[in-house]
Amino acid sequence: MNKKKIIISTLGMLIATFLVATLIPIQTFALSNAHFSDGFDSANTQAWSKSDGWSNGSMFNCTWRASNVNFRNGAMDLTLNKDSQGGTTPYAGGEYRSNDTYSYGLYQVSMKPAKNTGIVSSFFTYTGPSDNTPWDEIDIEFLGKDTTKVQFNYFTNGVGNHEYVYNLGFDASTSYHTYAFNWQPTYIAWKVDGVEVHRVTNTIPSHPGKIMMNLWPGTGVDSWLGSYDGKTPLNAYYDWVSYDQQ
C-alpha cells in the first residue's frame, strides 16, 4: 500500500471514529429515557402509536380510530365524532400512546381540553394487564362539563379512588397551559403552569407506564361526567409533551 492510500485510509478511519463517537451518546441518551419530548409538528411513528379499531368498553362510549388523531398548525388534535366505520359504539374517539414506557420523573403537557358535558380529555401514564403488569396509572383529566377545573387521580395495583379536583381560576379550553406531575418513589406532585397544586405520599405507583392522551365520551357515569348530549365533532388540542428523568 502506498503512502497516499495509507493517508486516505487513516483519514477515513478518523472520520468514522468521530461519527461513531458523536452518534452513540445520542442513541444511548434516547434509549435511557432520561429525556423525551415532542412538539407534535407531525406524527412520529417511532415514538408513538395511534389506537385504532377497539373500544375500552365499560364507561368508554367510543371506538378508537387512528383517523381521529391529527397534526395541524404545529399541534396534535384528538377528535370525538360519530363512528362511521361500523364499530360497536356510536362514537369514535382519539387516543395517542407512547411506544416506550417511562418511570419516575417529571411529565408535562401543554394542552387545551374539549368543552362539553359528558366527555373527558386526558394526559396520563398507564400500564396494566394488557402489558402483563399490575394496573398502575397517574392521571390529569379534564371533565368537559366544567373546564375551569382539573381532576388528578392515580391507581396502584388497580386501586384508585384518589380523585382530587383543583379549581384553575381560568377556562382551560380557551388557551394552552402547562399541566404536569412529578412522580417519585415516595410522592406524586401535580403542577399547573409550574406551580405545585396537589401532592400525595401514600401507596405510590411503581411500575413504568406509557405516556397517553385521549378524548372520549362516557356512558353510565353521568354522576361523574354529566350526561353526554351527542354533540360532535369535539376536539382536544396538545401543543407539546415532555418527560425528564429526575
Report each predicted region and the residues it spans.
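Bacterial N-terminal signal peptides
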Residues: G12-T22
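Bacterial N-terminal signal peptides that target proteins for export
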Residues: N2-L14
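GH16 jelly-roll
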Residues: F29-Q246
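Sec-dependent signal peptide cleavage junction
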Residues: V20-S32
